Amino acid sequence: MTTTETQNPTARATAKHVRVTPMKARRVVDLVRGKRVEDALAILKFAPQAASEPVAKVVASAAANAENNLGLDPATLVISTAYVDEGATLKRFQPRAQGRAFRIRKRTSHITIEVESVPTAGGTRGRRKGGAK
């Protein structure tokens, strides 16, 4: 027995070599995974982490790609996939006492956000069937 899944249209945006460590960027990406794009941008606007700005840029870019390239309605977009990969590491030296040098690793990230259009049920979101009790 085979099942046929209807694939929702998806759009993707990627930011490469962003100067933020992948560990810190993953904390921010975990906040918005699975959320609606409007809600995710509101969350990222008030998030105190420095990585929230580049993540918000990628989310907005993915939404714009969905709207302009695929003609999707921005109100129906949900972040379906969001992940952060490790980019190239810039290696620097910090001079220390007595002629020593310590290595400083300036890490970069590749942030990928994928949004898909999920049709909303006709206005029944969050409502009860019965009246007030």
From Swiss-Prot:
Gene Ontology terms, MF aspect: rRNA binding; structural constituent of ribosome
GO cellular component, one term: cytosolic large ribosomal subunit
Quaternary structure, from the entry: Part of the 50S ribosomal subunit.
Transmembrane spans: none
Entry protein name: Large ribosomal subunit protein uL22
InterPro entries associated with the record: Ribosomal_uL22 (IPR001063), Ribosomal_uL22_bac/chlpt-type (IPR005727), Ribosomal_uL22_bac/org-type (IPR047867), Ribosomal_uL22_CS (IPR018260), Ribosomal_uL22_sf (IPR036394)
Family: Belongs to the universal ribosomal protein uL22 family.
UniProt source species: Nocardia farcinica (strain IFM 10152)
Known function: This protein binds specifically to 23S rRNA; its binding is stimulated by other ribosomal proteins, e.g. L4, L17, and L20. It is important during the early stages of 50S assembly. It makes multiple contacts with different domains of the 23S rRNA in the assembled 50S subunit and ribosome.
Gene Ontology biological process terms in this record: translation
Keyword set, alphabetical order: Ribonucleoprotein, Ribosomal protein, RNA-binding, rRNA-binding
Tagged with keyword Amino-acid biosynthesis: no
Pfam families cross-referenced by the UniProt entry: Ribosomal_L22 (PF00237)
